[in-house]
C-alpha cells in the first residue's frame, strides 16, 4: 500500500481537510488567483492530449458527452503508464493506486472516435443484434470493456463485444446531428 502525505488543491477541496487530517495528511489549498505549478502542468498536459485527440477525429462538431469522455480518456491514458518523473519507473499511477495493470490486448484495442457495431444481448426475435457506436475509452475493468457513444441515443454505453468497421460518411453525419442537439 501507500499513504498520502500531502494533497495540493484549490478551495473546492477545503471540505475534505478534516478527513485528510484524520489520516495525518496535509491539505495545501491555494489562495484565490494563486497557482500551483504541479497542478497547472498536469492540467496543461491533459488539455494538450485532449486537443490532440479532438483534432484527430473526423468530426467537425461533437456532442458535449464526447468532449467530457475525451478528457476522461486523456486522464485514463496518462495514469496508465509510468511517468518519467513519477514515483516509480516501472509502475503506472493506476497500478500503484488500484493494483490494475494496463493490458494491451484488452485496453488498447480501439482509439477514441472509431466506429464500431457493439453487440447487444439478443433473443429469438427479429430485432437487430448490433448497434452503431463511437469508441470513447476503456472502462478499465479486467474483462476489457469499453465505453461507447450510442449512435441511436447519444448516450454512453458500456460493452465488451464489438466489431470494428470503417467510418462511413453517414456515421459522421449522425455524430454531427447529435452534436446539434447537445453541442459542446
Model-derived regions, located:
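Nucleic-acid-interacting cores, centered on viral/eukaryotic replication and modification enzymes
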Residues: 1-184
Amino acid at each position: 500500500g501507500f499513504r498520502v502525505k500531502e494533497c495540493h488543491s484549490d478551495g473546492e477541496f477545503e471540505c475534505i481537510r478534516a478527513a485528510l487530517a484524520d489520516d495525518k495528511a496535509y491539505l495545501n489549498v491555494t489562495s484565490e488567483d494563486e497557482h500551483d505549478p504541479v497542478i497547472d502542468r498536469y492540467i496543461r498536459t491533459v488539455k494538450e492530449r485532449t486537443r490532440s485527440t479532438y483534432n484527430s477525429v473526423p468530426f467537425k462538431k461533437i456532442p458535449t458527452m464526447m468532449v467530457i469522455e475525451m478528457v476522461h480518456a486523456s486522464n485514463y491514458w496518462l495514469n496508465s503508464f509510468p511517468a518519467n518523473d513519477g514515483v516509480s519507473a516501472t509502475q503506472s499511477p493506476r497500478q500503484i493506486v488500484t493494483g490494475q495493470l494496463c493490458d494491451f490486448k484488452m485496453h488498447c484495442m480501439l482509439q477514441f472516435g472509431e466506429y464500431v457495431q457493439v453487440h447487444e444481448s439478443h433473443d429469438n426475435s427479429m430485432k437487430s443484434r448490433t448497434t452503431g457506436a463511437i469508441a470513447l475509452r476503456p472502462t478499465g475493468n479486467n474483462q476489457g470493456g469499453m465505453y461507447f457513444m450510442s449512435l441511436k441515443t447519444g448516450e454512453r454505453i458500456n460493452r465488451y463485444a464489438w466489431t470494428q468497421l470503417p467510418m462511413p460518411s453517414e456515421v459522421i453525419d449522425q455524430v454531427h446531428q447529435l452534436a446539434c442537439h447537445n453541442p459542446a
